[in-house]
């Protein structure tokens, strides 16, 4: 018997005559090609009965069998069967729609807290609703859309309404036959499933089979909600799967669906919050975005008037206009909480409106008001005990990453059925099918934070519940974003005024324990020996502002001497300025400012809220406040900052002396401005380069026009300029600009110059060589890698090396010098007047032919200590010549780089001899070389030799066999002075060249 998935098809096939069935089978040989599917062998088709043919089709063409048979019915002139099949399909689709309508009407009524008429809700989300229709109605191809916004802005409510409207026949009717709605966080305890099982769990009886439903993926929409609270990592994976029937780990199924590996023809509508956007968005293909903007001031008033009767609503709306709570009420969930809180207050016949500057104060008012309405006359001790059970449930769920609770979870945490009924009435909890959830995930975070204020030493320890230091570590050092809201409440509840709100219902709650735990954690984090570093400082600053406790804020920020901040919005700039202006200990600040912060593009009128307009208006003030601390810093790193002209002018003003801040008060020693899109007209240089302690200036990746370069050079020539390290890599500096720079450095204090990754060409180097020949030039290091140089540049450098007495490091890496160019350099190095100590020549297209000259230099030059020849084709012959030179008693070389060079393991004997005879060699880089085991044995014998003085060997141990890795580990154990490292010089070379990566918070 064909499985239930093919029962409907079998009934239709049985209506075919034998002749029609034979013709049907013959046509089936060709039909798969129309659907771009692999054909079934004719032998299998020919020998099939009607029953076995259905099984065959469902096995080979899951999800396509129904459509294929509809087409074949028409071809055998049985249009009646095709019509009958389509009617069956429509009937079952209608059943599903009716079932979903009933389900989501219940959810909308019982679980969705709009508390206003539907017509009023549609007016509030009119823009987003139109966007949803346009996105899906205008496209016939699969679409992925995101509903984005901050927590509590109504994303889930919007999606529930969309689902209800589709099921009611008023939305996307011509686009989708099936719409499935899943809250993905409810899968947190499901380790394995198939997409077919997930879909089946939502289907009523007598629905189409999953095979039939998925036969036309273009008519299917998946609405996925709750990614902020999903515990699974959905990062890009190589083991994705296209089989929707196969049971797989939950994260593989979800990731395969999101990345369109599984059911690529379906459409997706996803709810993504601030936590999930950076984790999920990059997995999606060309997503369209619908942004929930929150309530405008007008919408808040409209909501209040809809929530209450007209007269009371007007009174509430008028009061809100002058209430600090208004900016919080732009969040729809908080607006609902505010109105609910007032309703309870009015029911108790209490006068006045509560005020709240922070989320913690807001939620505390809501929670206390709910308790007063139910337990007004209960002793505070009883209320505290009741509250503690709810808080324990919340915090246990947070640590387990659990947001959907069963009856056992409630019972284990001391919540009885009668307690549950009270929490449901208070709207702290709500039902979720047969399970229970908090009324909003943010409410769970609030009660979880409250747990730490109710906790006592005598309490029984629950192993799964972490300590405050563990919680803070997850938030600020390990980047676990699901804890951020809890952290905001934890800091907010520290406030004495917020604690006072709790006292009437719950007695005296002392926040000092939590405060001390927080301070202790950051004290440890700020110590150098701590393995963890602060990663989310902007979140910390937001939490500190929510505490509203000046002394506490100062105590925390003064524990941190170095901070990295990613400023992505005006609000982040605001909290950063608030926190850092209170620091007296900060020495190093690494700052990244995104383009949107200083953008002059405003939102459309319908998106404007009082909050958003205020933020834009105050951005300049926040920036000025932050700039005010720069004079006290020792290191300022402006990495990939996107400024407008006004912001640059404010930066310039902050670095200028005033009557209250004289020039001598500025402590800045190091300034980096890498990858800045706009450096202004260059007038900033005059201000910066007069700072009395500024010794280091790095502009890597920041384009400098000719005019800006000239202003930089003018500032360098000023006698007040004390810059010693000037790093101008990747600044678009031409040969002509290089000439101007060279002239400005003749009488300057600059000792280290990096011009890497600029098209200087030979003409530019000629100008630099003229500078080097001037007796007034004090330059000691010159970095010229990737500067489009040829052997001709080496002719100019030959003369400069002979006349300059200060230059000790010359980097010519990754230039087309060839053997001819290096031979010219060797002639200079053989001269006793040449004082160069380090020569970097990696990737210069060298062969073994230049190694004879280099070897001669190693023998006769007593000054050269470092020679880097990596990534050159010097072959075995070249390595042997170098090893002979190293073995010479006159050789003084200390560091030799042969990483990525072309040579074989046969050279290991020569290297071993050099290691045991050269008394000065302490660093040998063979990184990226995978020597065979026999060669490695020879090398390791030399490393264990008592005459070997090597301290660093560059090798990637992980690239070798287990046997070879064990050999290298044994060498390190026996020789305590030796370190075998991968990328041994990477950081040092990067620092010397001044190169930076494009912004990353971990850079």
Swiss-Prot record:
Tissue expression pattern: Predominantly expressed in the intestine, including proximal and distal colon, cecum, ileum, jejunum and duodenum (at protein level). In the ileum, expressed in epithelial cells. Also expressed in oocytes at all follicular stages and in preimplantation embryos (at protein level). Although expression decreases in preimplantation embryos, it is still detectable in blastocyts.
Origin: domain of life: Eukaryota
Entry binding sites for ATP: 149-156
Domain Pyrin: 1-91
Database matches in Gene3D superfamilies: Death Domain, Fas (1.10.533.10), P-loop containing nucleotide triphosphate hydrolases (3.40.50.300), Ribonuclease Inhibitor (3.80.10.10)
GO cellular component, as recorded: canonical inflammasome complex
SMART domains hit by this protein: LRR_RI, PYRIN
GO biological process terms, semicolon-separated: blastocyst development; defense response to virus; innate immune response; positive regulation of interleukin-18 production; pyroptotic inflammatory response
Keywords attached to this entry: ATP-binding, Cytoplasm, Immunity, Inflammasome, Inflammatory response, Innate immunity, Leucine-rich repeat, Nucleotide-binding, Repeat
Alphabetized GO MF terms: ATP binding
PROSITE patterns attached to this UniProt entry: DAPIN, NACHT
InterPro entries hit by this protein: DAPIN (IPR004020), DEATH-like_dom_sf (IPR011029), LRR_dom_sf (IPR032675), NACHT_NTPase (IPR007111), NLRP_HD2 (IPR041267), NLRP_innate_immun_reg (IPR050637), NOD1/2_WH (IPR041075), P-loop_NTPase (IPR027417)
Subunit record text: Sensor component of NLRP9 inflammasomes. Inflammasomes are supramolecular complexes that assemble in the cytosol in response to pathogens, such as rotavirus, but not encephalomyocarditis virus (EMCV), and play critical roles in innate immunity and inflammation. The core of NLRP9 inflammasomes consists of a signal sensor component (NLRP9), an adapter (ASC/PYCARD), which recruits an effector pro-inflammatory caspase (CASP1). Within the complex, NLRP9 and PYCARD interact via their respective DAPIN/pyrin domains.
Primary role: As the sensor component of the NLRP9 inflammasome, plays a crucial role in innate immunity and inflammation. In response to pathogens, including rotavirus, initiates the formation of the inflammasome polymeric complex, made of NLRP9, PYCARD and CASP1. Recruitment of proCASP1 to the inflammasome promotes its activation and CASP1-catalyzed IL1B and IL18 maturation and release in the extracellular milieu. The active cytokines stimulate inflammatory responses. Inflammasomes can also induce pyroptosis, an inflammatory form of programmed cell death.
Record-given protein name: NACHT, LRR and PYD domains-containing protein 9B
Source organism of the structure: Mus musculus (Mouse)
Gene: Nlrp9b
């Amino acid at each position: 018997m064909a499985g239930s998935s093919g029962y409907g098809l079998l009934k239709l096939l049985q209506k075919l005559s034998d002749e029609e069935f034979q013709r049907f089978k013959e046509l089936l040989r060709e039909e798969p090609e129309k659907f771009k599917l692999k054909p079934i062998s004719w032998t299998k088709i020919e020998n099939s009965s009607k029953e076995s043919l259905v099984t065959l089709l469902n096995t080979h063409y899951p999800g396509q069998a129904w459509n294929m048979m509809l087409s074949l019915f028409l071809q055998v002139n049985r249009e009646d069967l095709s019509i009958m099949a389509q009617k069956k399909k429509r009937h079952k689709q209608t059943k599903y729609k009716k079932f979903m309508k009933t389900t989501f009407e219940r959810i909308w009524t019982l679980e969705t807290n709009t508390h206003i008429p539907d017509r009023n809700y549609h007016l509030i989300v009119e823009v987003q609703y139109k966007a949803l229709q346009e996105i899906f109605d205008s496209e016939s191809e699969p679409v992925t859309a995101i509903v984005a916004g901050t927590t509590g802005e109504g994303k889930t409510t919007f999606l529930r309404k969309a689902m209800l409207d589709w099921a009611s026949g008023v939305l996307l009717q011509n686009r989708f036959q099936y719409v499935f709605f899943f809250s993905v966080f409810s899968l947190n305890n499901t380790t394995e499933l198939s997409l077919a099982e997930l879909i089946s769990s939502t289907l009523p009886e007598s629905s189409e089979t999953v095979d039939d439903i998925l036969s036309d993926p273009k008519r299917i929409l998946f609405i996925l909600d709750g990614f902020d609270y999903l515990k699974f990592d959905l990062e890009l994976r190589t083991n994705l799967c296209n089989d929707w029937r196969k049971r797989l780990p939950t994260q593989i199924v979800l990731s395969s669906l999101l990345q369109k590996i599984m059911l690529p023809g379906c459409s997706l509508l996803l709810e993504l919050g601030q936590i999930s956007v950076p984790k999920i968005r990059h997995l999606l293909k060309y997503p369209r975005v619908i942004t929930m903007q929150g309530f405008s001031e007008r919408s808040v008033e409209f909501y209040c008037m809809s929530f209450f009767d007209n007269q009371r609503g007007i009174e509430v709306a008028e009061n809100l206009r002058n209430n600090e709570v208004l900016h919080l009420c732009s969040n729809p969930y908080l607006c609902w909480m505010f109105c609910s809180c007032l309703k309870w207050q009015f029911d108790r016949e209490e006068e006045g409106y509560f005020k709240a500057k922070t989320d913690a104060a807001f939620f505390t008012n809501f929670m206390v008001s709910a308790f007063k309405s139910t337990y007004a006359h209960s002793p505070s001790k009883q209320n505290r005990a009741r509250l503690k059970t709810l808080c324990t449930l919340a915090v246990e769920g947070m640590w387990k990453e659990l947001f959907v609770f069963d009856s056992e979870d409630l019972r284990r945490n001391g919540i009885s059925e009668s307690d549950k009924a009270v929490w449901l009435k208070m709207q702290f909890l709500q039902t979720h099918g047969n399970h229970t959830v908090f009324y909003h995930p943010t409410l769970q975070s609030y009660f979880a934070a409250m747990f730490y204020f109710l906790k006592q030493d005598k309490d029984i320890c629950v192993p799964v519940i972490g300590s405050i230091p563990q919680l803070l570590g997850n938030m600020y050092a390990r980047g676990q974003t699901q804890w951020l809201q809890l952290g905001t409440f934890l800091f907010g509840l520290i406030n004495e005024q917020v604690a006072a709100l709790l006292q009437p219902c719950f007695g005296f709650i002392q926040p000092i324990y939590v405060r001390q735990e927080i301070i202790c954690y950051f004290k440890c984090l700020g110590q150098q020996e701590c393995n963890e570093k602060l990663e989310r400082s902007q979140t910390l600053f937001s939490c500190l502002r929510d505490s509203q406790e000046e002394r506490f804020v100062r105590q925390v920020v003064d524990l941190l001497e170095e901070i990295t901040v990613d400023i992505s919005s005006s609000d982040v700039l605001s909290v950063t300025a608030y926190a850092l202006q209170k620091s007296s200990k900060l020495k190093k600040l690494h700052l990244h400012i995104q383009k949107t912060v200083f953008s002059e593009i405003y939102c459309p009128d319908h998106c404007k809220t009082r909050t958003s307009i205020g933020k834009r208006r105050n951005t300049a003030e926040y920036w000025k406040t932050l700039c005010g601390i720069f004079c006290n810093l020792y290191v300022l790193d402006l990495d990939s900052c996107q400024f407008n002209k006004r912001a640059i002018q404010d930066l310039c003003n902050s670095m200028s002396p005033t009557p209250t801040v004289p020039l001598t008060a500025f402590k800045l020693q190091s300034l980096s401005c890498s990858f800045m899109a706009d450096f202004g007209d260059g007038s900033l240089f005059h201000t910066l380069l007069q700072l009395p302690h500024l010794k280091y200036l790095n502009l890597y990746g920041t384009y400098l026009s000719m005019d800006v370069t000239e202003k930089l050079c003018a500032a360098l020539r000023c006698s007040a300029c004390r810059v010693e390290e000037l790093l101008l890599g990747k600044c678009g500096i031409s040969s002509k600009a290089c000439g101007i720079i060279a002239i400005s450095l003749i009488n300057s204090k600059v000792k280290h110059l990096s011009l890497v990754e600029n098209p200087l060409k030979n003409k530019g180097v000629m100008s630099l060589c003229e500078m080097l020949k001037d007796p007034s030039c004090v330059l000691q290091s010159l970095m010229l890698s990737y500067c489009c140089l040829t052997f001709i540049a080496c002719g100019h450098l030959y003369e400069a090396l002979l006349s300059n007495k200060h230059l000790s490091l010359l980097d010519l890496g990754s230039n087309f010098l060839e053997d001819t160019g290096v031979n010219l350099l060797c002639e200079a190095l053989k001269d006793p007047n040449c004082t160069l100590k380090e020569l970097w020549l990696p990737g210069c297209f060298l062969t073994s032919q230049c190694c004879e000259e280099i070897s001669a230099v190693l023998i006769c030059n007593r000054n050269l200590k470092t020679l880097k020849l990596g990534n050159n084709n010097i072959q075995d012959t070249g390595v042997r010549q170098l090893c002979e030179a190293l073995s010479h008693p006159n050789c003084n070389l200390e560091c030799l780089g042969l990483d990525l060079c072309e040579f074989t393991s046969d050279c290991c004997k020569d290297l071993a001899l050099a290691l045991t005879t050269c008394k000065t060699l302490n660093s040998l880089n063979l990184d990226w070389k995978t020597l065979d085991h026999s060669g490695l044995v020879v090398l390791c014998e030399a490393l264990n030799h008592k005459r070997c003085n090597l301290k660093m060997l560059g090798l990637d141990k992980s690239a070798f066999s287990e046997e070879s890795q064990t050999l290298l580990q044994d060498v390190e154990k026996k020789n305590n002075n030796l370190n075998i490292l991968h990328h041994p010089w990477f950081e040092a070379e990067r620092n010397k060249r001044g190169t930076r990566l494009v912004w990353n918070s971990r850079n």
